[in-house]
């Protein structure tokens, strides 16, 4: 299966390169690609940093009504998919974990987060 690559160009000149894994979270990857291909992620600042925990790229749907949607938790829809571990160096889709909903928002964990496994698609 093809693994799309997304590159975030930071204002300081650094790049963050993300390999997307559609076999692990097909709907979530499609949601991210939708937002990226329509420019909804362009020129967006980091929304918040929770020291020692994660960096949120958005918790306000990037300010676009087109991204204010929710998709069901990947693992409820696809129970055969083994959830991946959340740890530094990966990207996780944000949303409302306890409600089992996500969107195109995402965050970078700054620590191992075993409590995220099966809640936030990695």
What are these regions (language model features)?
Residues 1-122:
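Cyclophilin-like peptidyl-prolyl cis-trans isomerases
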